[in-house]
Structures are given as C-alpha cells and as structure tokens.
C-alpha cells in the first residue's frame, strides 16, 4: 500500500526548536516524529511512501538516507518554490498514485494509536472518495457530518463561519485528526498545480461524492505541532 506524509511545514509554533531543524525531525521521547509516523505506516502494511518537503528539506533527505529509507521505497516531493497547502501539495504528488488504489495521507505531526487497517477497510466498505479520521474533542474548527457519517459541512468556531449542505437534518461536529484515506479519483476534481486547501475540495465534492467520517474516540492522539502537546506526548511515551 502507498501513503503520503505531509512534512513540508515550517513548524512555526515549535520555534525556537525549528530554527535549526525541520518540524519532521523534532523528537518525541528521543525519536523524530517522522520516524514514528513512518514506522506506524509500515506496521499498517504501507511499503511505499512519498513525503513533501520545504523547510530544511536537506535535513530530512539526509535523515532518510542515514536510515536506509527504513527498508521501503520513499520518494520526495519538493516544494522549494513555496508551500502549496494541503491540496496543492497532494496534487503535486499525484504522479505517485497512478495505480488507482486508495492510499493513506498522514500529517507528520500527528501521533495516534488509530487502527489504520480498520480505517482502510471502512473506507473500502463505504466506497468513499475520501475517509477522514475524526474525534470528539474541543477544536476551533469542525467538520460537519450527517447521521450516515457523510461530510456535509464545516464550521469555524472563532469566526462563526459555517458551511452546511444539509441544513434541515441533524448534524454532528467532529474534529479532524490529520489522517485521511483517499482514492486517486479525487485528482480528477482538483485544480491544477497551484496552492489550495484539500478541505475546500472535500466540501465542494461532498454533495455528489461520499466523503466519510471514521470516528476514533478511544486511545491516544496528539497534534505535536504545538509546544504543550509535544510536552504531553513526551511524557506519555516516556511512561509507555
């Protein structure tokens, strides 16, 4: 199976650590977050990975070479001319997914014990265009889903902005966990190679294509792109 890791971010929230290293190589209990994500993907059956790079890209490439690419095929998608956001970054790497099989998209700063094999099985059972790992937790932004767990909107709590394609039915708000399963068909509906958000694409497609929720409320989940969460994750893995 194939996967993509979003690893191009500048890690602004983790400064001053990221003044000298890329966010992807920030360590959690002595192990770089990139290594933790790669190893989780391998344990879930992934044997081919592409990751996008930008900030201190050479550090990441050197790290992968020093670790013999963890024994699998790992390709690099360079965003040297500027970050392309989630949608643009994914679209630039679309050549990697020409086999027309579902793949995992995973943020480098997300650590969890989510069962990716079950998520893939769920995605295939629902014949979804994309499946989003979501969680009941406090957030400033939520995806909105109907009672069939199908995406129907989005809400920004801070600004009050709401997009709701299903206004007359009961909806549930769930926070995104930074992990997707995607069918390559989605590239047919994406803009050209430009900067854009995959969230907007999901919302635009959700009325005509199944974009599904995969709730995972048990176990651990950390967004370690934030200093407090990084500290908490260090303590958790130190005691594990």
Name each model-derived stretch.
Residues 1-19, 44:
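N-terminal nucleotide-binding beta1-loop-alpha1 segment
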Residues 3, 25, 76-77, 130, ...:
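Generic preference for hydrophobic
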Residues 20-33:
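Short catalytic helix/loop segments, enriched in acidic residues and glycine
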Residues 103-104, 111, 117-124, 137-138, ...:
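Catalytic-core segments of class I nucleotidyltransferases/pyrophosphorylases
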Residues 126-136:
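A short, conserved acidic/glycine-rich loop-to-beta-strand motif
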């Amino acid at each position: 199976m194939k996967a993509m890791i979003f690893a191009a971010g500048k890690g602004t929230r983790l400064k001053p650590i990221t003044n000298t290293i890329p966010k992807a190589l920030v360590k959690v209990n002595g192990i770089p977050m990139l290594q933790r994500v790669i190893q989780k993907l391998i344990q879930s059956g992934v044997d081919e990975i592409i990751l996008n790079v930008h900030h201190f890209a050479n550090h990441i490439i050197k790290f992968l070479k020093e670790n013999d690419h963890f024994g699998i095929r790992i390709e690099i998608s360079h965003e040297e001319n500027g970050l392309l956001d989630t949608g643009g970054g994914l679209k630039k790497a679309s050549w990697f997914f020409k086999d027309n099989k579902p793949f995992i998209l995973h943020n480098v700063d997300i650590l969890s014990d989510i069962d990716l094999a079950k998520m893939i099985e769920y995605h295939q059972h629902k014949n979804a265009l994309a499946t989003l790992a979501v969680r009941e937790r406090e957030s400033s932004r939520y995806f909105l889903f109907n009672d069939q767990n199908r995406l129907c909107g989005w809400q920004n709590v801070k600004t009050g902005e709401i997009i709701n394609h299903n206004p007359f039915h009961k909806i549930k708000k769930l926070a995104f966990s930074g992990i997707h399963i995607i069918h390559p068909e989605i590239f047919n509906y994406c803009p050209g190679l430009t900067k854009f958000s995959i969230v907007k694409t999901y919302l635009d497609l959700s009325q005509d294509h199944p974009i599904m929720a995969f709730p995972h409320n048990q176990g651990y989940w950390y967004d370690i792109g934030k200093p407090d969460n990084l500290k908490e994750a260090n303590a958790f893995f130190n005691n594990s």
